[in-house]
Design a protein with these regions (language model features):
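Short, surface-exposed ligand- or partner-binding patches at beta-edge/loop junctions that are enriched
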Residues: 87
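Rhodanese-like catalytic fold shared by cysteine-dependent sulfurtransferases
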Residues: 1-35, 43-83, 92-129
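Active-site flanking residues adjacent to catalytic metal/cofactor-binding acidic residues
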Residues: 38
Length: 129
C-alpha cells in the first residue's frame, strides 16, 4: 500500500509551519518560570533516559485532549500564561504535535532536535530514584 504522504514528509511540513527552539536556547531557558517544557515521550522513555528538570509529562496520545478546555481530560497547566515548548526524543513527534496544537489555536513551540540532542549538549537531566 502506497501512502499519500510519508511520516518524514509530515514532519518536514510541520517544521516549516511551527516555531522551533534550538537546544542551546532551551538549555538557557530551563529555569525561566515563564517557560513550560512539556515532554511527549512514553513513560518508559522517561524512566530509561531521564527527563528535563521541571518538565511536565504529557503522553502524546492525550495531548489534544489535555490542552482542550472543553475536554473532560483538560489539564489546568495548559491554561497558564506561559511559553510552552514541547519535546520528544528526536523532534519528530513534537513537530507534528505542535503543528496540530497551533491548528487548534494553542500557541506552542518545539525543541528542534529533541531530548537526544539535549543530552548530547549537556542539558540537565533528572532521573527518578
Amino acid at each position: 500500500m502506497a501512502l499519500k504522504k510519508s511520516s518524514a514528509q509530515m514532519v518536514a511540513d510541520a517544521r516549516a509551519r511551527i516555531e522551533e527552539i534550538e537546544t542551546a536556547d532551551l538549555i538557557a531557558m530551563v529555569d525561566d518560570p515563564s517557560v513550560q517544557i512539556v515532554d511527549l515521550r512514553d513513560p518508559r522513555e522517561r524512566e530509561r533516559t531521564g527527563f528535563i528538570p521541571g518538565s511536565f509529562h504529557c503522553p502524546r496520545g492525550m495531548l489534544e485532549f489535555w490542552v482542550d478546555p472543553d475536554s473532560p481530560y483538560f489539564k489546568d497547566i495548559f491554561a497558564e500564561d506561559r511559553k510552552f515548548v514541547f519535546h520528544c526524543a528526536s523532534g519528530w513527534r513534537s513537530a507534528i504535535s505542535v503543528d496540530t496544537l497551533n491548528d487548534m489555536g494553542f500557541k506552542a513551540a518545539h525543541l528542534k532536535n529533541g531530548f537526544s540532542e539535549w543530552v548530547k549538549l549537556g542539558g540537565p537531566v533528572e532521573t527518578k530514584g
